[in-house]
Amino acid sequence: FGMTLLIPAACRRRARLFDNPMLKVDTFNFVAVEGFGWFEDAMFGMRRGMPRPRNVMVPSIMAGIWLGYKRICLLGADHSWLSTLTVNDRNEVVSVQPHFYKEDEREEKRIRQEYVRHPLHEVLDSMAIAFRSYHRLQAYAASRGVSIVNATPGSMIDAFPRGEIS
C-alpha cells in the first residue's frame, strides 16, 4: 500500500530525496493565518495556512482535513501542561512534562533553560494560543463536515467532543 508524506512547503526541494513509487510527497504551508473568519476559511481551504501551530497537533489535524478524512480521532492528546507548571523560589517557571519516553539529560537541560527565560504569563499565553487554535480547527472542521473526536481520557482539550476510537 502507498503512503503520503506531508512536509512543509519550505522543504519542497528535499522531496526529491524520497524517490519511491509507494510514497507520495505532498506539501503544506506551516503559516499561521488569523483574521476574519471568511478569510481564514479561504486560506485554510487553499492550504495557504492554518490556525497558529503551537505544536504538532494543529498541522496534524489540518492535514487530516486537507486529505479528506471525515472523522479524525485524537489519542494521547492529554495536554495537561497546566498541572506541570510551578514557579520556584527564584521566580523561575518550572515545567516537568511527563512523556511516555525518557528524556535524556541534554533535553531536560534544554527544557529547563527554555522555561527559565520566560515569565509565567508568556508561558500561559503560549498555551492559550494552542487551545484557541483547537477551537478554530473545530469550527473549520465542522463547516467542512469533518468530525474531530477526542478519545484521550483526562484530556484538557475542550474544543473537540469526547468519544471512543470506534
Task: Tell me what each language-model feature is.
Residues 1-166:
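Metal-ion/cofactor- or nucleotide/acyl-coenzyme-handling active-site neighborhoods
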